[in-house]
């Protein structure tokens, strides 16, 4: 029989300072034989029943190349969720392998070389776009009505660059959005345009004979006069005709716009020599049009045609937005219009591109201005055309970081750091202070960066980070969509307003933790929350919580039934089926979202849960699952998932407390694969707190992935480990986590891999001189 090293002695074998070959020798001599003997029956390349081929790992270096997989292996062994109960693996071997893998991954994660990784160039997601437009032009744009929903990727967020590509439809939407925004900001004086008879004659060569310039245009039967014109707004317009008939009889006159008949006067009355005005009211869309006049029977003289926009006076808000952009009132034209437009564009581009711009970057938009000027557009319309070009420019729509071609790790430029920071915490462009610090080159200073993190988290705009991060991480942002809050049997306690409150509750909890630097462990066991009077009723606390109005208030739970995210109605409702709680969904949610474990999908041939309960309508969900687990195919995974869900069975499918289910007392007891037993949500939370390291690693990875906008790689584990060490020293503060993410190497620097290097390879952390090119 093999003689195994006691676990403490085995750990000493891989302490820092020991040669790397010791780890490889120990793996080959001690660890691999245990895996081959106890695990290779399922985990092999010939007939695999699991995602890992243990026999493939020949050396310790092979483990380093699959850190995520082996970290999960160690967790499964540590928590006794693997191997199956029937395995012959001894407790000593199980602990030895788990400890060795954990230590080896930890020792090799930080090998003295930094890892920054690289970020895919990505467009602004629709939230970022809307907020940036708001801060750039002062307009709140309903992006949900314009743009399709962004997908999620990476660590599970819509900030991931791999999902933020630009489908063709989105290009059209950007152009539409630019027009909408600028029409709401820029006030163009109402159109008032007139055409003389001579102007109209230019469109009909045959009518020019015998007609003097500036005199009336005589239109004979069948003749048609046309005049092109443009309007600058979707609006109503009046087309006025000043006509003179040539004979005594009445003359019907047909007016067309874009070939469409806009009305005929069947018997107009004109004085023989004087002129009388007739008008048509039409609705026109912004853009070019063609006016046509036809007198099909009798010659008449056209003295002039006038087109006037029927415009309401602009609102005070629109006038203010216009003045903010132009620095002058609508209708006022600067003495040197082109120079003024150039100055306006330079300032606007700097904000839109989130960095200083060069003259060459302004020129293309000045050409748009010139094109508009050549066709006679007013000053406001010329600027509008130029700005619309900016708003569909890739340098506005994408977060561009200029790559350094030399292999290695390179500091980001100050304006790139400012942009990363502002979109991380505010989902918008940098404000004046961040931009000023970037101009001064001060964002390379970690003390300055840390101060900016505090300033930005104290700003109300940080609510958008709390809302987005929590809603997407916990999966609560869709509450109210899946369970429609208009069902008659729910209206007493569940309405659209209650659904909105339930979505907001975890956001306020997390935002409060950020504001007060509360421990991250509050997410597991906080004895406080934020409630409205509607939620007091929803949670059935009317007799225990008083004085709460329609606005959210910080409230301490009156008992310990609820605590942290485990007691939030939004979480509990989103992890249930319709009118049926689900220990499976809830257990899997805790494992994946809270502890960061990978829960495998059910096998394709697994029988549906409903089949186990067929013919047994009086069974509780627990009894149904017990019948389901009788199938060996289902037992392994459910042994890991179900106990956690059972601990939450006192909460019904909407997250309200219950003591009975189908007339039977709720059984909320469970036993984890590790052997820990609990009964009810209070004891379940205590079990979860014992696994705080797994939780803290998971939330650190989630925040880092959200901030970077990419999937984490093996090389990022050193950063994660360093952040966790700092968290431990600072009582696991939520604000501390944000600060350490911002100060981390991957956030402040970027990595250029050698052309032949694999994505996860480590590149020498050579620092190059900072490139200050804007």
Which residues are covered by each model-predicted region?
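Sequence context surrounding c-type heme c attachment/ligation sites in exported
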Residues: 17-72, 79-91, 536, 551-690, ...
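Long, ordered, helix-rich scaffold segments
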Residues: 335, 341, 363, 379, ...
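Sec-dependent signal peptide recognition
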Residues: 2-9
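Aromatic- and Gly/Pro-enriched helix-to-coil junctions and flexible linker segments
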Residues: 10-197, 297-298, 308-326, 350-358, ...
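Extended surface/linker regions that mediate inter-domain or inter-protein docking
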Residues: 100, 120, 128, 132, ...
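A short tyrosine-centered beta-strand micro-motif
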Residues: 237, 289-291
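Extracellular carbohydrate recognition and processing domains
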Residues: 257-288
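Short beta-strand-plus-loop segments that form exposed binding edges in beta-rich domains
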Residues: 292-300
